Amino acid sequence: MPDYGHPLRFATFISPANSPAHRPVELAQLSERLGFDFVTFQDHPYKADFLDTWTLLSWVAARTERIGLAGNVLNLPLRQPPAVLARASASLDLLSGGRTSLGLGAGFFWDAVQAAGGRRLTPMQGVTALSEAIDVIRGIWDADGPGTLYVEGEFYKVRDAERGPAPAHDIPIWIGAQKPKMQDLVGRKADGWLPSLPTMEPGGLPKGNAIIDDAARDAGRDPRDITRLLNILPGQQTAEALAQMTLEDGVSIFILASDDPDMLQRFAAETIPAVRDHVARGRT
């Protein structure tokens, strides 16, 4: 697949561990000082040893100035209802000065989700519920839309809901998608595809891009409008290999999963400049 031409950006993926509670905040602040574009946190609300991700994002927003913020990805079955999630994300965007992105997942670890009070869904139900949730979220954000909001879905029924507030900027919706049905949803409704390289099958990037691009065109969208992100592990790929993923598979945001300050510093000082150099030469 081609390079979609998006600006090259980098992010960190930090565990929201609560012992000590201030540690994820310090790593987020370090990420900002090192020049990363985003800091992201996984979302497992059923884990007692994790901070609540949404509370953490709000606290990090208050303790940083520039860096973008996102869940990676928010567990939709436990972030209910979507209208409230829409207002929460718009509020964070307003308070942070337009730094919020909304990473969403259909749900995983269903035993834990159900134990915490969430509804267990089949894979197809999860896709449908996420699709409906996106409609609700975008409808709430559309503060100048006509009248009140109505969404009559299988999982979410919103009737006569007030719209707003509008976020400070157009919040991108990134979907964590590994399977074809979810990738199809990315192409139809999302602003970004956020898979994880460690769990991806060989050839997963070009295969996923093909599904997303076809779905986007079928929906009357330009595939180039969809950002391609990728979670990566330290040392998993060389700078040359990462640059190749940009030039051949369109990945424009690489997200480093590490809680090691030294690793974050080395990646920022060595890998990021090398990737930028390779991509710049490849794009000329």
Feature roles, as predicted:
Residues 1-284:
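Active-site-adjacent structural elements that line small-molecule/cofactor binding pockets in enzymes
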